[in-house]
């Protein structure tokens, strides 16, 4: 259980820390990436560099900078918003009311909503109510025009695209994966149906491991994964999403980024471009975790879900 300790001294400054599992971490205010000056300078001094080479991208507190700067760290491809104006998000500001809300946390302490945002290292938050923005705040490295890593929310975008292609008859979810992608014959997906992949009901020899190097989006790696047993039981795994994206691209002749652009970014009237992290070797997307998007454009996608696929008067 997390324990919050007030005004402990960290380094030469008096700052607040959070304690978790016996370790202390700078809190949301003290870990603000703007205060650390990550990647500033020409070139940045060694102790301010955030790179995969020095293994600081996923290290706290550098992580609070890297999640809003992934295209400076990895190869990416653009998701273009088009030349038209963005769709309007009406505002009905209730920030003062929401910031003042209080609740009792797991440690029986009364806490204000605004303080909880700092305690949970929030980079940005936007609340839509019936299509109107009632609350919007940004912290640290994030700003309204800056894209933030979506991580596994990317899977929701990929699944939405796949469901639309099935609905339109472009994809037949009863077919096996090897019928779409012959390169996956002899793998764990050879006899899995597209529907089983879409529902993460494959039984392949893969375990989600967030402590090792992620290879789950690489075609060469996917071809090494074998079957462990009968398909049909749900097990969460990102490799299924990457196989699904491979199927979509093979069937449509469009990349994952192009499908996002044509079927979501343009129709939704998104405000900013997005970008997708890709395999530097062959350009294949990290469809399980590689989308980076602004908070308002993420809200537009959420509103599309709330309205059951209806947007700007179109289904």
Predicted features, each with a name:
Residues 1-142, 168-171:
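N-terminal leader/targeting segments and the immediately adjacent pre-domain N-terminus
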Residues 202-278:
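A small/polar active-site loop signature that marks catalytic segments
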Residues 223-228, 233-234, 258, 273-315:
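Penicillin-binding protein/beta-lactamase superfamily catalytic region
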Residues 117-120, 124, 149-152, 233-237, ...:
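Aromatic-acidic/polar surface patches that form glycan- and anion
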Residues 149, 167-202, 252-289, 293:
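Active-site helix/loop module of the DD-peptidase/beta-lactamase fold
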Residues 104-105, 109-117, 132, 143-150, ...:
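Active-site-proximal loop and beta-strand segments within enzyme catalytic domains
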Residues 110, 190-191, 215, 240-241, ...:
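A structural signal for well-ordered alpha-helical scaffolds and beta->alpha junctions
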Residues 131-134, 151-170, 197, 234-265, ...:
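Alpha-helical scaffold elements that line and support the substrate/ligand-binding pocket
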């Amino acid at each position: 259980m997390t324990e919050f300790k007030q005004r402990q001294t960290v380094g030469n400054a008096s700052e607040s820390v959070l304690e978790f599992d016996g370790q202390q971490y700078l809190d949301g205010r003290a870990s603000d990436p703007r205060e650390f000056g990550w990647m500033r300078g020409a070139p940045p001094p060694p102790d301010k560099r955030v790179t995969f080479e020095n293994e600081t991208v996923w290290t706290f507190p550098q992580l609070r900078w890297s999640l809003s700067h992934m295209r400076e760290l990895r190869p990416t491809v653009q998701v273009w918003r088009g030349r038209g104006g963005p769709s309007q998000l009406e505002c009905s500001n209730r920030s003062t009311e929401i910031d003042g809300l209080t609740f009792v946390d797991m440690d029986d302490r009364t806490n204000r909503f605004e303080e909880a945002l700092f305690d949970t290292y929030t980079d940005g938050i936007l609340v839509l109510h019936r299509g109107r923005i009632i609350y919007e705040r940004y912290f640290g490295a994030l700003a309204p025009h800056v894209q933030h890593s979506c991580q596994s929310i990317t899977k929701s975008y990929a699944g939405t695209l796949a469901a639309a292609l099935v609905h339109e008859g472009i994809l037949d979810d009863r077919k096996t994966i090897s019928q779409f992608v012959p390169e996956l014959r002899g793998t764990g997906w050879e006899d899995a149906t597209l529907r089983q992949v879409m529902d993460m009901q494959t039984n392949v020899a893969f375990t989600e491991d967030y402590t090792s190097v992620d290879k789950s989006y690489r075609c060469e790696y996917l071809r090494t994964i074998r079957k462990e047993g009968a398909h049909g039981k749900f097990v969460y795994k990102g490799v299924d999403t990457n196989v699904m994206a491979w199927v979509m691209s093979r069937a449509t002749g469009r990349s994952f980024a192009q499908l996002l652009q044509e079927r979501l970014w343009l129709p939704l009237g998104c405000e900013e471009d997005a970008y997708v992290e890709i395999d530097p070797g062959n350009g294949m997307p990290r469809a399980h975790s590689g989308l980076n998007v602004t908070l308002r454009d993420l809200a537009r996608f959420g509103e599309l879900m709330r309205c059951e696929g209806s947007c700007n008067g179109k289904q």
